[in-house]
């Protein structure tokens, strides 16, 4: 029974042959591509095809679709045309995503490294982080390094840290 159905399928494929390429061959090629792993999540290599086998397959699909799409006189079903358009869009989208990833990589990892000169601030830094050297200079002008400020309650401050003796003990300098 299956042999008869295979013969009718082959007859249909031979009826729709296009310049040496049959429509069934193109459909088979597109079905094989749909088995490859296309996902938005973690990378996963297909058990059916290796990475080196995918490029010739994509090139073959691209050639077949470019032979079918430009010629409106060919008797090709609208479903096949839509499938070719979908495959072409997927290919363009994946190339666009690779470009975006490359741009993102370059943005994060192309920061200029200073040669020890702390006066030069990088343009990649956040604007508030660029103010840190100025704040440090202002604080150093306000308080000298050996001067300690005494705050009521036994708190010693040198501008950066607060020191409070533990357990209520006070040093002799505070009495």
Swiss-Prot record:
The modification Asparagine amide is found at residue 167. The keyword Signal applies. Skin. Its main location: secreted. GO terms for molecular function: hormone activity; neuromedin U receptor binding. It is found in: Secreted. Residues 1-20 form the signal peptide. The keyword Cytoplasm does not apply. Residues 21-104, 105-139, 140-142, 143-144, 171-175 form a propeptide. It holds the Pfam family NMU. Keywords: Amidation, Cleavage on pair of basic residues, Hormone, Secreted, Signal. GO terms for cellular component: extracellular region; terminal bouton. Belongs to the NmU family. PANTHER family: NEUROMEDIN-U. Stimulates uterine smooth muscle contraction and causes selective vasoconstriction. This is Neuromedin-U. It comes from Ranoidea caerulea (Green tree frog).
């Amino acid at each position: 029974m299956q042999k008869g159905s295979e013969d009718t399928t082959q007859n249909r494929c031979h009826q729709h042959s296009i310049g040496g390429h049959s429509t069934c061959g193109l459909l088979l090629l597109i079905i094989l591509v749909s088995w490859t792993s296309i996902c938005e999540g973690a990378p996963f290599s297909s058990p059916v095809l290796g990475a080196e086998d995918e490029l010739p397959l994509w090139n073959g699909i691209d050639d077949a679709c470019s032979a079918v799409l430009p010629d409106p006189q060919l008797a090709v079903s609208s479903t096949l045309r839509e499938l070719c358009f979908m495959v072409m869009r997927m290919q363009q989208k994946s190339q666009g995503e690779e470009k975006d990833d490359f741009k993102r990589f370059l943005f994060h990892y192309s920061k200029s490294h200073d040669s020890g000169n702390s006066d030069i601030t990088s343009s990649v830094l956040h604007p508030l982080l660029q103010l840190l050297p100025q704040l440090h200079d202002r604080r150093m002008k306000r308080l000298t390094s050996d001067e300690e400020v005494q705050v009521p309650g036994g708190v010693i401050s040198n501008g950066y840290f607060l020191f409070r003796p533990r357990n209520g003990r006070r040093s002799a300098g505070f009495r």
